[in-house]
Structure formats: C-alpha cells, structure tokens
Amino acid sequence: MMDESADIKPVPTSEDVAAPSGTEPVAPAPKKKRARTSTKAIMAAIEQRLGHTFADISLLTTAFTHVSALKSSRGRCDSYQRLEFLGDHVLGLVVSDMLYRAFPKADEGELSKRLADLVRKETCIDVAKSLDLQEGVKLGAVGAGAGARLRRSVLGDICEAVIGAVYLDGGYAAAAAFVERNWLERMRKPVRPLRDPKTVLQEWAQGKGLPTPVYREVERTGPHHDPRFRVAVELPGLESSEGIGGSKRAAEKAAASAMIVREGVK
C-alpha cells in the first residue's frame, strides 16, 4: 500500500516565501481598531428619534450635559439645568392644553390630577428611556458614580431639558409636537391615584383605632451622591413593611405603599 502521507506537502507560510528581488518585504497589515461612535453621530441618531432637526445643535448638546461634566462651577450655566427649568414649564403648558381639549367635561380637580401624573419625574424617565436618551448623556466622574451607573433622576431631568431645547430651537409648535408624540398615549391611560400613600395609611390606621405609623431607617447604602435608603413602617399588631428609595421620604412612601397593598387598603 502506498504511503499517502508522503504526497502531502506543508503549505508555505509568509516567512518561507522570499520576496521578489528588488522589492521590500510586505509588512503585515495592522489590526483595525473598533471605531468609537462619535458624539456627532450619536446626536444625529437622537435627532431622528426626537423627530426634530436642530438648527442650533449646541442646544441639544447642552441638554445632555450634566453639571458634573463641567470643569468648574463657573460653567454651571453650560449644563442642562437652565434648559430643564424651561422644559419643565413648557411641558406643563403643553400637557395642560392637551388635557383641556381632550377632556371637555372634566373639572379642575380631575384635570389637575391628570396633569400631575403626566408631568411627574417618573413619566419623564419613561419617555427618556423609550427614546434611548441615555446614549447621549455627558457625565463627569462624580455624576457617573460607581460603575458609571446613570441615575434615573438624571434621565428625567434630561427629558425636560430636551423639551426646553426643542422649544428654543423650533418654537412652541415644535415643542408641542414633540410632547404630543410622546405623551398622547400616556394621556389616554386611566389616571393613577395621586394621594400620598403615607397619608392614606395614616387615615386607615386612625380609622382602625391604631396609632400613627412609625417609620424606621433600616439601612443606607450607595455613595454619598447617590444613596439608597431602606425604611420599615410599623403599626401595632401588624407585620412591618419595607420600602427602598433614593431618599428617606421616597423610601417611606414605598414602605407605606407596600403595607397598603398587603392590607388591602382602599
């Protein structure tokens, strides 16, 4: 039997092949580095999602700049804070107009409840997430925090700042169009109960002949600029309930809500 392995010759490598006479050896091509997405490309993508092309792109850039990204306190006016202030009021005006036209039979109390629900921070955070606005946020070392974690509150602020930027760039009509695109479906949803859960729990306890609920801080975690609180609420004869929040007040509300749900408080 013929040894087939004798006919198999090794494939020459680049080191085995001599360069033709009179030519320099060809150096291997350098490895390509993965290109980072430029700020300009990110802003262009965000413009598309917003549905507004900025004549002054610096307004959009400022709307995404957290104060921690600035080198000195003198540059605070270059952060999104002023635009957030403006956008907050523009949002309130546009949503008020939308509610007035959408619910002609609603009284002032119902309109106020619906307005409060639609302009609250959590709603702005939801809108920001739906538009992937976190992609454009500019944070400094302090703002980024441990693990470059983006605080939820920053997203809500930026959403309002974007509204302010659109208003300055395109006027009321442009800002109103943006708000209507992103708030219309939310406006059509049933309004949530807006009463403070701590008040609801206290009134329920009093009706049962119980003392005022006691709130106790159980734990505080996280860095100084982004703390997380765990609070327990206690009532005699009932199992305590706990809540977590970015402030003691928020954690207390969460704890009260947990007890309200568990006890079936209406």
Curated annotation (Swiss-Prot):
Keywords: Cytoplasm, Endonuclease, Hydrolase, Magnesium, Metal-binding, mRNA processing, Nuclease, RNA-binding, rRNA processing, rRNA-binding, tRNA processing. CDD domains: DSRM_RNAse_III_family, RIBOc. Mg(2+) binds at E84, D157, E160. It catalyses: Endonucleolytic cleavage to 5'-phosphomonoester. Its EC number is 3.1.26.3. Digests double-stranded RNA. Involved in the processing of primary rRNA transcript to yield the immediate precursors to the large and small rRNAs (23S and 16S). Processes some mRNAs, and tRNAs when they are encoded in the rRNA operon. Processes pre-crRNA and tracrRNA of type II CRISPR loci if present in the organism. This is Ribonuclease 3. It comes from Nitrobacter winogradskyi (strain ATCC 25391 / DSM 10237 / CIP 104748 / NCIMB 11846 / Nb-255). The lineage of its organism: Bacteria, Pseudomonadati, Pseudomonadota, Alphaproteobacteria, Hyphomicrobiales. The gene is rnc.
